[in-house]
A protein has these predicted regions:
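Short Cys/His-rich micro-motifs in 6-15 aa windows
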Residues: 36-44
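Cys/His-rich microdomains that often coordinate metals
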Residues: 19, 39, 79
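Short pre-active-site segment immediately N-terminal to redox-active cysteine/selenocysteine motifs
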Residues: 60, 67-71, 114
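Short linker/helix segments within small regulatory modules
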Residues: 21-30
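Short cysteine-rich clusters marking metal-coordination/redox-active sites
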Residues: 12-15, 32-35
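A short beta-strand-turn-helix
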Residues: 44-63
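Non-catalytic, surface beta->alpha helical segment in thiol-disulfide oxidoreductase systems
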Residues: 114, 119-147
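Thiol-based oxidoreductase modules, predominantly thioredoxin-like and allied folds used
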Residues: 46-47, 67, 78, 82-86, ...
C-alpha cells in the first residue's frame, strides 16, 4: 500500500471515499470522485477514530499524525508549524491531528507517553516516531526522511 509510480489511493477528507489518483495528477488539486470535495486542503485534518482508520488503513499515502492535547502548551505552540508543514508536504504526505483527550483509544493503542508526539505511518504501520515540539522545517525534514 505505497504510492506507486502510476497512482495513489487517496481518502477523501470529507466523505471518506477512496480515490485512485494518477501520480502526475497528485499536485493538480484533485477532487473526490464521489462528493467533488478537494482531496487536499493544504492543512492538517482533525481526526476522530473512524477518519484515522480510513486515512491510515485505506490510503496509500504516508500519513503523519500529530498526537496532541488542548491543555499542552508545546502542542499549541507547534500547531502553526505543523499547519505550515502540511502546505509543504501535501500531496506526498497526508497530515492528521489527533486530540488524545477526545480520542483516548488512539493514544492508548500507540502508547503515547508524551505530547506532542508525531508518528509517520506507511502502509498502515508505524514507520517512525518523534516526540517534542519542532519548527516547520524540522517537521518537513523529519517527515521526508521517514517517508
Amino acid at each position: 500500500m505505497s504510492v506507486t509510480t502510476d497512482s495513489a489511493l487517496v481518502v477523501c477528507p470529507d466523505c471518506g471515499a477512496p480515490n485512485r489518483v494518477p501520480a502526475p495528477r497528485l499536485g493538480q488539486h484533485p477532487t473526490c470522485g464521489r462528493c467533488k470535495a478537494p482531496l487536499f486542503a493544504g492543512k492538517p485534518l482533525d481526526a476522530d477514530l473512524a477518519s484515522f482508520e480510513r486515512h491510515v488503513g485505506r490510503g496509500s499515502l504516508p500519513v503523519l499524525v500529530d498526537f496532541w492535547a488542548e491543555w499542552c502548551g508545546p502542542c499549541k505552540a507547534m500547531a502553526p508549524a505543523y499547519a505550515q508543514a502540511a502546505q509543504v508536504l501535501e500531496p506526498q504526505v497526508r497530515l492528521l491531528k489527533v486530540d488524545t483527550e477526545r480520542v483516548p483509544e488512539l493514544g492508548q493503542r500507540y502508547q503515547i507517553r508524551s505530547i506532542p508526539t508525531m508518528i509517520l505511518f506507511k502502509g498502515g504501520r508505524e514507520a517512525a516516531r518523534t516526540s517534542g515540539a519542532m519548527p516547520t522545517q524540522a517537521i518537513v525534514q523529519w517527515a521526508r526522511s521517514a517517508a
